[in-house]
Amino acid sequence: MKKLLCLTAGLFVLLCIASPVSASTYSAESRYFGPGYEVSMNTDTRMSYWIVWNSQDEAKALDIPFDEIQNVDAFKDAVDNCYRAENDSIIAKSRIWSNILNIFAIFRYMDLRDTALDEASYYAEQADVLFEHL
């Protein structure tokens, strides 16, 4: 009985250690979206996307496939909503809208399948820099 328990416990530990961790999702904290928010990249599907989520795992921005241009409008709305609480001026909104494609340009040309965690962090920081200057 003791051997069976030891064997069972050993197998359990081995399975826990050997269980695969998804290498297709990379996350990096995003200063722009506030504490606890991350920019996550998921490459499980043919269309890779970024999604912004908070520490309660609530989706904040959107699922944004890169090859669907209509999602640019949805992303504009998400960014606009982030700004609305701080500054409701027309000037701020027009600057956000005029620069939104620059934000997309950073992510569009990445080879997402080969992007490592440090690269995800780098591009999240670059997005933050763009957001701060909108």
Predicted segments, located by residue:
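Composition-driven detection of intrinsically disordered, low-complexity segments
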Residues: 7-8, 91
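Extended amphipathic alpha-helical heptad-repeat regions
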Residues: 64, 68-134
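Domain-level detector for secreted/extracellular nuclease and nuclease-toxin modules, and
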Residues: 24-73
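Sec-dependent signal peptide cleavage junction
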Residues: 17-25
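Cleavable N-terminal signal peptides
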Residues: 10-11, 21
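Positively charged n-region of N-terminal signal peptides that target proteins for export
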Residues: 1-4
